[in-house]
Amino acid sequence: GGTNADGVYIVRPSGSLSIKTSRIHGTLVVILGAGKRVQVNDRVLIHPYRADYPTLIIKGDAEFNFISDNLSETLALTNFNPPGAPYNGVTDILPLGSYPSEIQGLVHVTGIVTMKQTSRIRGVVLAAGTGADAINIEDTPELIYTPSLFTAPPQWYTKEVRMPIQLGTWSQPAN
């Protein structure tokens, strides 16, 4: 499909979904069937297109099994910042750059979260799974908290919404 003005992309795979050796600049929403999962492998850079949107929303389980070494354009034979897709404001036409291998921003998973290898998430993981195995940590992954996600959370992730009453806009009906 085409591009979305807000950088939001919804995927409904028929099975599990594997993401590897890629840069995703947007909000990826993955809706999985029962017993399926998203696996993030190898080296990736996933970051939101809009700072006020989450990075990943996964309805199902997620396994972050990637390496925090740099994502290399040379090794992947791919240009990850072509014209129209800048990284830190820069584009080019040659596959010679490298980028941090990490997920940046808010990650929301409704099922079980597993973090392995040297996976790095720079942000917040909202794990909505239940039970003792809702979050599994193996090897030496990193979760680097980003305080701004608490003080200025992405849309729809607020703690509360205050709705002040405006004078003259309500009344109590008589019994």
Where on the chain are the PLM-derived regions?
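Long, polar low-complexity repeats
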Residues: 1-175
